[in-house]
Amino acid sequence: INSQSGKGGVAYILQRDFGFHLPRWTQIDFSRVIQQEAESRQTELTSDDVISVFENTYLNQSTLALQDYEIKNTAGAVSFTGSVRMGDDIIDVVGNGNGPLSAFINAISAKLNKNIHVINYAEHALTVENQSPLTQNNSDANAVAYLQLNIEGEIYSGIGTCSSTVSAMLKAALSALAQAQIADTEHH
């Protein structure tokens, strides 16, 4: 895969070799990442390089992590209470919404004082025969969620894996937020 390779090539490798079925909007986001990587290395990327960049971009971000959380559904109103590790700090977040994701986004949005909206969301089961080295050792990662967020007018994609679809979804939100933080520090 080189900097001229299309979105399809990268998405095909992730699907065939690792079981990730990237939605179109994630393909577009990731192909941009791969193109930058190929250009900075000035070399073609192998499928191992592709999964490594994929995992480092979306799955292994270490700036934000979900700690404990509780979701309550009371008469259709969903509340999220939990804590998120941000760098060295643990912050408590509380929010309400019409589902776990919107409650979490509202909680994070209020805590960070940022406008955050969900644009796209997709999820699927990770099939066992196509597991990346990252998920092989962690057979719990059998759900993957893809999320596209509008954060203060900028668009970011995030991906999360977990045994629980809800946790995968929340991790995807943190993955997108981490992309925003990285972009923020690069632009300032």
Language-model features, listed with the residues they occupy:
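Terminal or standalone catalytic/regulatory effector modules within metabolic enzymes
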Residues: 1-188
